[in-house]
Amino acid sequence: MKVRALNAALRVLVVGAGVAGISLARGLLRDGHDVIVFEQRPDLQAGGGAVTIWSNGATVLGQLGVDMAGAGQSLSAVQVTTSTGRALATLDMTAMARGLGAPVRMVPRRVLLERLLDDFPAERIRCNARAVGVSGTDGEVRVDFDDGSSVRGDLLIGADGLHSMVRDLTDAPPAKPTGWSSWQGLVSLPDLVADKRVALMIVGKHGNLGLWPAGGYELQWWFDLPWSADFVRPASPIGMIRQQFAGWSAPVDRVLAALTDDDLAGSPYPHFRHPVPGAGRGAITLIGDASHTMPPTMAQGTNQALLDTMVLCKALADLPPEPSHDDLARALRWYENTRRRKVAAVSRVTALQLSHSELVLRPAAFIPDRLHTWGMTMFLRSVSHRRMSAEISRGLGLADISPIAG
């Protein structure tokens, strides 16, 4: 059975209008497909704090035509110390940008989503659309919604995050908690940051924290602590956080003094990790956190979702002119197989608890900073499909992304 000639466009149904869903929709619309994005929330306002855009994610954003100039804050270094002030490592982000072709940016999530939605056709997004069921037959997929309506298409992409309904209905294994959680958010402190391009991470015996400039006077803060399913939220979360982290550094104390319980209202965010799923079924697949939720240890979640977009768009672009249902299924399985090894590598690294142990990380102080920088650069190279990315950029007539200030 033929699905539809590509010159007439595949009808793609995307469940979830976060960064993963909108980035994929941008790529598929660019390639001439007929895309509709369904979101259960009444609007697309992004919550949370900021995200780190590494070179691999920046390259995909460039391919999608997303203008990131002036968004957030580019970083020149990440300094890692212990809670007693001992220097462990400094990552040279400027050197990494030279080696990888794009700067590292800390960008508020709301700003990233705004940039993704620039020039995005509003009629392609349907809010207040809560999907409750999916099904697939030979040559067609269907999504059912809680208002009794349904919609049909040629393929379905689950981009609906950690608690993905689409993932549940594909029988993929559920996410498991790692035993840690983050209390996090953004704060505006004009008098705090001496160098707005330097991020700070501090590792202690029983927790860690980060203070990362996110553009203007905004600062992304997070405090990581152990977590379990029987966690009882304290009456004053900020009191607990201050008790754990006060005295770690002058900037930390300044942030702790500025925060209130209201700033912690949405926290904590427990860390989960999905087992990377096996092959999907038929014309249904997953991207982003719906596919591979991982702890924020390496700040790769958003970037890996963007790489999902790149590889999935490539898979569909390589379909024959009049693809059969089997052709489409093979393209989706190719996408899943191509991503699986690299996503699994990132997931394994993020699951390590080394970053939460001052004792384990003390030997890092004896390793030259240039080797820390080199190691992170090589890691990003290894998980980024750089050859494919370069070919796609050339095909789109894009020059290499070069580091920019700001």
What residue spans do the PLM features occupy?
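Short beta-strand motif preference
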Residues: 143, 210-211, 220-221, 286-287
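FAD/FMN-dependent oxidoreductases across multiple families
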Residues: 205, 214-217, 225-304
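N-terminal polybasic phosphate/anion-binding patch
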Residues: 44-46
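Conserved mid-domain beta->alpha element of the FAD-binding
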Residues: 15-42, 157-158, 183, 261-356
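Conserved N-terminal helical subregion
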Residues: 2-12, 29, 54-170, 174-186, ...
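C-terminal helical "tail/cap" subdomain of flavin- and related membrane-associated enzymes
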Residues: 2-10, 298-299, 314-406
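Flavin-dependent oxidoreductases
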Residues: 180-212
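Short beta-strand micro-motifs enriched in acidic
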Residues: 136-137, 212-216
